[in-house]
Amino acid sequence: MRKNLTEIVFILDRSGSMSGLEQDTIGGFNSMIKQQKNAEGEALISTILFDNVSEVLHDRINVKDIQPLSDHDYMVRGCTALLDAIGGAIHHIGNIHKYARREDVPEHTMFVITTDGMENASRYYSNNKVKQMIEWQKIKYGWEFLFLGANIDAVETASLFGIDEDRAVNYQCDSEGTALNYEVISEAISAVRCSVPLGSNWKKRIDEDFKKRGNRK
């Protein structure tokens, strides 16, 4: 196992319901990557954008070589094939680790999944299949999965995929909520990269924001 190397996989919703938040998503993602370029240790970044289909924007790229996300990269459209995006990414990363030399397998692997709506377009993966895949990687290899959801019950939805309650959070799907998401995600990634145990408090700021501002509506 390669010490101080973290595999980070972002699965980002770009379905039509994200319309109006393109610049907030782009800005938040770029700010997070900039912070991670200056963090301790090494990191490989994979970014999967999904709507009806999945697009691999980055495939295990050194974080220091990641170029800023642009509006040409992130254009919203289509429906929400969330399960296919998650299942495909786990299959890809899992196969790479399986056939790599043991000393080349990253010390940590972390998936960050964000969506603002319910699954409605996957063709290849089911809830049960994705749940089996996630639980296997968590138990066998200690992979981390974070799930951030808007306009759904994020905790309940995550549980269908085998993601624990303390790794799921509801967020406000607006400019402020999106910016906060990426701030908190960056903090969580930094903790994992430094081998600091990720407790349930990682999501406290998002929880508080959701409860405070959600009650106004």
Language-model region placement:
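Acidic, low-complexity intrinsically disordered regions
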Residues: 1-217
